[in-house]
Design a protein with these regions (language model features):
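N-terminal glycine-rich "phosphate-gripper" loop used for MgATP/nucleotide binding
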Residues: 65-70
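ATP/nucleoside-binding phosphotransfer catalytic cores, i.e., glycine-rich phosphate-binding loops
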Residues: 16, 185-187, 191, 224-305
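Short, well-ordered alpha-helical microsegments
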Residues: 47-48, 72-73, 206-207, 281
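Catalytic core of DAGKc-family lipid kinases
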Residues: 4-6, 15, 24, 33, ...
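Gly/Ser/Thr-rich active-site loops/lids in small-molecule metabolic enzymes
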Residues: 150-161, 208, 212-232
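ATP/NTP phosphate-donor binding region
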Residues: 1-62, 73, 77, 303-305
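A generic structural signal for short beta-strands and their flanking turns/coil linkers
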Residues: 175-177, 193-195, 216-221, 255-257
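Glycine-rich phosphate/pyrophosphate-binding beta-alpha loops
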Residues: 137, 198-211, 278
Length: 305
C-alpha cells in the first residue's frame, strides 16, 4: 500500500518529539509490513492544506494523520470526502477518537498497530454539512472553551489547568437559553430552556472523558441539561468525573439519526463547539449521522484459540 502521513508538529506530544527520528521509525514499521510510507511534517497553520493535498495524490491507498483532536477531526472529514482509509496517530491531550477506535495512545506503539491494521467502516456525522467525529455542543461546554481560550497555556498540563479554571468559572455563571429540537424529522418539535446540549457521533460511553465506546452504531447521541444553578453544575461535574453523567437528574439522553436544532432567541456572538473548535453558532443546525461511511485503520482481529 502507498500511504501518506501528515503530522502536525505543533500538536501536543509532537512538540517535544524528534520528528525526523519519529518519521524514520514510522517508515521502518510500515516497510516491515510491505507498505510504502511518506511522512510530511508541517506546522499547525498548514495542516489543512497538507491533508487536502495528500488526499488528492494519485495512487494513494491510505492517509495517516498525527496531532490533537482538531487535526484528527479535520483529517477525518478530508479522508471521508476522498474515500480514503484514515489512520490516527494520537498526539493530542484527550485523543478522543483514538480512544473510540481503541488505539494505543502512545505515538510510538501505535505505529506497529497501524502498519498491520485492517480497514473498518465507522460512522461520521455532520453539522450543517461540516464533518465531525466527536460532538457538537452548545451552552456549558462552549462557554468553558471560550473562557479557556482566553487564557495562556503552552503545554498539555497548562491546557488541563486552563480547562479546570474555566470549568470553575462556568460553574459560577451557568448559561441558560432556549432550543427547539426535532428528532428524526418526526414533525414533533419540542421547545425547552436548557443550560447545555450535546449531540455526539454515536452515544457517549460511561466514562469521564466523553467519548463513544463504539462508532459504528449508526446513531447520534443527544443530551440535554435543563437550566442549572451553580450547585446543579457542580453535581453534574461530579457525575461526569465518575462517568455517570447520564444518571444525572438534570440530563435527558436519547439517540437519533438526524437532529434539527433551532435557537429562537439567537444572538450574535453565541458560540458552539465542534470537535473542540469554538465556532460562531448559527440560528439553525442540522445534524446527521453518516453510518459506515468513514474508513479507518484499526487493530486486526485476534485469532481465537
Amino acid at each position: 500500500m502507498k500511504i501518506k502521513a501528515v503530522l502536525n508538529r505543533d500538536g501536543g506530544t509532537f512538540k517535544t518529539t524528534d520528528m525526523q527520528t519519529y518519521c524514520e521509525s514510522a517508515t521502518r514499521a510500515f516497510a516491515a509490513k510491505g507498505h510504502e510510507l511518506v511522512c510530511d511534517v508541517v506546522p499547525g497553520a498548514e495542516i489543512v492544506d497538507a491533508l487536502e493535498s495528500a488526499s488528492g495524490e494519485a495512487g494513494l491507498d491510505a492517509l495517516l494523520a498525527g496531532g490533537g483532536d482538531g487535526t484528527i477531526s479535520t483529517a477525518a472529514g478530508i479522508a471521508w470526502k476522498a474515500g480514503l482509509p484514515l489512520g490516527v496517530i494520537p498526539a493530542g491531550t484527550m485523543n478522543l477518537f483514538a480512544r473510540s477506535l481503541k488505539l494505543p495512545l502512545d505515538i510510538w506503539k501505535v505505529l506497529d498497530l497501524l502498519a498491520g491494521a485492517k480497514v473498518a467502516n465507522v460512522d461520521i456525522a455532520t453539522a450543517n454539512g461540516r464533518p465531525f467525529v466527536h460532538q457538537f455542543s452548545a451552552g456549558l461546554h462552549a462557554r468553558m472553551v471560550r473562557m479557556r481560550n482566553q487564557m495562556d497555556f503552552a503545554s498539555r498540563i497548562g491546557k488541563i489547568r486552563a480547562s479546570t479554571s474555566a470549568a470553575f468559572g462556568v460553574m459560577l455563571d451557568p448559561p441558560r437559553f432556549e432550543v427547539v429540537f426535532d428528532i428524526d424529522g418526526d414533525g414533533r418539535s419540542d421547545e425547552r430552556p436548557i443550560s447545555a446540549i450535546s449531540v455526539s457521533n454515536n452515544p457517549l460511553g460511561n466514562n469521564s472523558l466523553f467519548f463513544a465506546d463504539r462508532v459504528d452504531t449508526g446513531k447520534l447521541g443527544v443530551y440535554l441539561a435543563e437550566p442549572l444553578e451553580p450547585t446543579g453544575v457542580g453535581k453534574l461535574a461530579f457525575d461526569i468525573l465518575r462517568g455517570k453523567f447520564k444518571e444525572n437528574e438534570a440530563v435527558t439522553a436519547s439517540t437519533a439519526e438526524r437532529v434539527h436544532l433551532h435557537f429562537p432567541k439567537y444572538r450574535k456572538g453565541a458560540a458552539c463547539v465542534l470537535d473542540g473548535e469554538l465556532l460562531r453558532m448559527p440560528p439553525d443546525v442540522e445534524i446527521k449521522i453518516h453510518a459506515g461511511e468513514l474508513k479507518v485503520l484499526v487493530a486486526p482481529e485476534q485469532p481465537t484459540a
